[in-house]
């Protein structure tokens, strides 16, 4: 059995190819710019014969146009209501999606976490129209399969920060990138930004795209693909870079703690490029603020989670953390 998981994130895509027959797992990445200028399937074919792939699992953008995991041929409008208000758009992900859809490779599309997902607690559905994009579902599934917890908080800390609560093996609720803790790039819109939006200095989407802790050190902004490396490069020598990361850690702790009273087993799983950057020492710093059991997912957990979802669907699983599978 060969399955492929695709994590379509802010800075590009990460791909996991899981070959159960040979017990081999292969990863590769493509930047958003690369994706726009190259054939995704041409790149995938370098690692695995396309005819041998049993199932691809992927998400697209916010995933708010579908409520269950569906075959790609049954998905309308790429599974989104529209693509406005979702951060900077390059076009590579759209090109990849259409290339896969036209290929006849068996593929399922994973929804995002939004108000029409029925396993979510009614109070979260009343509060928020959207809680997570599809790759966060894949990361949560990777955490579930890796650690086997029935109850846990997943906090994915990268260009944005999204924290999800899983209770009794089902998604219960969470905080999207534009609601709670900021990420490196994206974050909640505050008073100053509301004024800038109302005075037509910036759009709401532009505000969201730079409302993360990058606003502390905006001169280090190098676009969605290169800002992380720029911050890391200057972290030990630039006080503002250090302040940005320290601010991020504090806000993540606040977000996780706000969900802890609903998390009976006190298990927290961290993921994402900021969480796994050794220089930031995130786990030890978060332990100062959080009373719980903190674990970390190394590597490309979104891509691996997608491959695991595809594998379990082929093995007959009817739901993924409470989200129905309809194939």
Swiss-Prot record:
Protein name (record): UPF0285 protein Maeo_0978
Classification via InterPro entries: ATPase_NBD, Methan_mark_12
Domain of life: Archaea
Annotated family: Belongs to the UPF0285 family.
Record organism: Methanococcus aeolicus (strain ATCC BAA-1280 / DSM 17508 / OCM 812 / Nankai-3)
């Amino acid at each position: 059995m060969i399955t492929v998981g695709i994590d379509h994130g802010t800075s590009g895509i990460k791909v996991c190819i899981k070959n159960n027959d040979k017990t081999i797992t292969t990863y590769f990445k493509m930047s958003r710019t690369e994706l726009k200028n190259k054939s995704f399937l041409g790149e995938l074919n370098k690692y695995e014969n396309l005819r041998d792939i049993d199932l691809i699992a992927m998400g697209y953008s916010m995933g708010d146009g579908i409520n269950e995991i569906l075959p790609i041929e049954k998905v309308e409008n790429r599974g989104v209501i529209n693509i406005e208000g979702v951060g900077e758009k390059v076009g590579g992900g759209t090109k990849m999606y259409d290339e896969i859809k036209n290929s006849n490779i068996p593929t399922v599309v994973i929804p995002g976490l939004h108000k029409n997902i029925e396993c979510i607690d009614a109070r979260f559905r009343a509060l928020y129209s959207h809680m997570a994009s599809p790759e966060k579902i894949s990361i949560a599934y990777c955490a579930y399969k890796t650690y086997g917890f029935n109850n846990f908080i997943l906090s994915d800390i990268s260009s944005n920060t999204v924290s999800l609560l899983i209770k009794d093996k089902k998604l219960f609720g969470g905080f999207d990138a534009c609601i709670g803790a900021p990420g490196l790039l994206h974050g909640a819109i505050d008073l100053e930004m509301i004024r800038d939006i109302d005075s037509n200095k910036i759009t709401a989407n532009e505000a969201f795209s730079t409302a993360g802790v990058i606003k502390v050190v905006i001169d280090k902004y190098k676009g969605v693909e290169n800002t992380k490396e720029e911050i890391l490069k200057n972290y030990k020598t630039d006080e503002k870079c250090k302040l940005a990361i320290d601010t991020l850690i504090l806000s993540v702790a606040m977000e996780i703690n706000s969900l802890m009273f609903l998390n009976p087993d006190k298990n927290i799983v961290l993921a994402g490029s900021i969480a796994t950057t050794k220089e930031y020492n995130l786990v030890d710093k978060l332990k100062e603020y959080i009373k719980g059991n903190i674990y970390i997912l190394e590597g490309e957990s979104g891509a691996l989670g997608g491959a695991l979802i595809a594998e379990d669907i082929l093995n007959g699983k009817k739901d993924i953390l409470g989200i129905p599978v309809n194939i």
